[in-house]
């Protein structure tokens, strides 16, 4: 199947293969089996038509499979955003009609292509994002932090990132009964804020 596709000029990323075949192919490191992210650098004047950038660039043929993405950005504007403080950057993006920076879109597309999500832990002295494969359960997510937390896993207190922003603290969420208790088989979602209860 792979040989036929390669001889026909079809990238391996476009093939649908069973997991055991994918494992066998891993050792060969075929470049065409890797996810493809195309970042298009647009002129400022073309930003309002960013949704048509793929068509205008004539790269539709590269974006036929599920493992390909194109993200249009304007590098000049991204440089300006990077040099501003967060409040000014938000106002600047709002003036341009941008909901998020190009860098954020590239990161999101990369995570999506690689099959990763992020969850957050919030503490007194540290807030942190953790990257895990999509479909990871709560106990294995706890193992990303420390193997002792995974072994002693009892429950996970879970809320959405947006809810934490609205209430301000986990204590406020607890007071309003907005923290859910989930077991070890709970599938962690992108943007979950989790406090792991564990035995020491």
Feature map (PLM): residue ranges:
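C-terminal-of-GTPase-core extension/linker across diverse P-loop GTPases
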Residues: 1-189, 194-200
């Amino acid at each position: 199947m792979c040989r036929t596709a390669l001889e026909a000029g079809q990238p391996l990323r476009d093939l649908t293969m069973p997991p055991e075949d994918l494992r066998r192919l891993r050792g060969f490191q075929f470049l065409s089996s890797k996810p493809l992210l195309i970042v298009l650098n647009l002129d400022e004047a073309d930003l309002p038509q960013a949704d048509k950038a793929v068509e205008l660039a004539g790269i539709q043929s590269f974006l036929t499979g599920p493992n390909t993405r194109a993200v249009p950005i304007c590098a000049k504007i991204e440089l300006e955003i990077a040099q501003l403080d967060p409040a000014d950057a938000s106002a600047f993006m709002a003036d341009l009609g941008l909901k998020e920076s190009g860098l954020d879109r590239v990161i999101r597309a990369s995570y999506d292509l690689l099959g990763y999500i992020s969850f957050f832990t919030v503490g007194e002295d540290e807030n942190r994002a953790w990257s895990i494969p999509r479909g990871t359960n709560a106990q294995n997510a706890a193992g990303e932090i420390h193997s002792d937390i995974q072994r002693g896993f009892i429950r996970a207190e879970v809320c959405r990132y947006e809810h934490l922003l609205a209430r301000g603290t986990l204590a406020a969420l607890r007071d309003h009964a907005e923290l859910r208790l989930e077991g070890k088989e709970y599938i962690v979602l992108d943007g979950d804020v989790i406090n792991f209860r564990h035995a020491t």
